[in-house]
Amino acid sequence: MIRWLRSHPLTGFVVLAYTGSWIFWVPFIPLQKLIPAESYKPAAAGVGQLALLAGPLLASLIMTRLTTGSLRAWTSSFKRWRVPPVSYALALIAIPAAIMTASAVLPGKEAGTPSFVGPAVVIGPLIQGVVFLIGGPIQEEVGWRGFALPVLQERIRPLRAAVVLGVIWGGWHLPQFFVSAWDTPQNNVTDVLGFFAFTITGAVVMSWITNLAHGSVLLAILAHNSINWALVTWSCLRCLY
């Protein structure tokens, strides 16, 4: 098994990432009906975190260790913060601006009761940014952009590598379509195809930023967090107008 993983780094990573996450996600699908309403969201959040830790994060640790003999490359990518300033501008400003602009222009659900009122209009989005950061991007990006992207780019050109990674990333989310507590569109096949279009587009943008930042996983994490933050924060703020 170890020999096979070493000789098939990309496939090995994908198998480990999917298995590690799905082993938590898939059983939760039938079990969710047995969970009391008041415990449903905390249970779903807990299972989601376990899946993130056991999926792309653990897979990247295992594969980095097996393919390089150490975790030095894994940890050094976190510390790579001295990168071109344009990388930060794209990750922290351009992405949220683009998503919020698109959300304002494109048709969506009718606005409901505002989630943020008073001082919370400022404080709420800041807190959300921190919560989202530790709730997914860190665990995911050490795997997707930290391990899988460089391996793919050794074989194919960056743009094609990003598209392939977007499909892999989208497929990894599939069990989430069957759990209402997880923020994944669940209405029809069009929603699924739209989600894959979103993950492919997101993968292209985040891979571009990561490459601009000389492979910095830190910038990939910030870019991923900006996507999550902008999507949710806009839905909270649009109710005010």
Protein language model features and the residues they cover:
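Residue-level hotspots within the lipid-embedded alpha helices of multi-pass solute transporters
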Residues: 125, 133-138, 170, 195-200
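Alpha-helical transmembrane segments and their helix-entry boundary regions
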Residues: 10-14, 88, 147, 161-162, ...
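Specific transmembrane helices
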Residues: 2-137, 165, 232-241
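Short juxtamembrane and helix-loop transition motifs at transmembrane-helix boundaries
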Residues: 123-129, 178-188, 209-211, 215
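Membrane-helix boundary elements
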Residues: 159, 166-188
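Membrane-interface helix/loop boundary segments of multi-pass membrane proteins
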Residues: 139-166, 207, 211-216
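Functionally important transmembrane alpha-helices
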Residues: 26, 163, 187-241
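Hydrophobic/aromatic residues in alpha-helical transmembrane segments
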Residues: 101, 148, 202-206
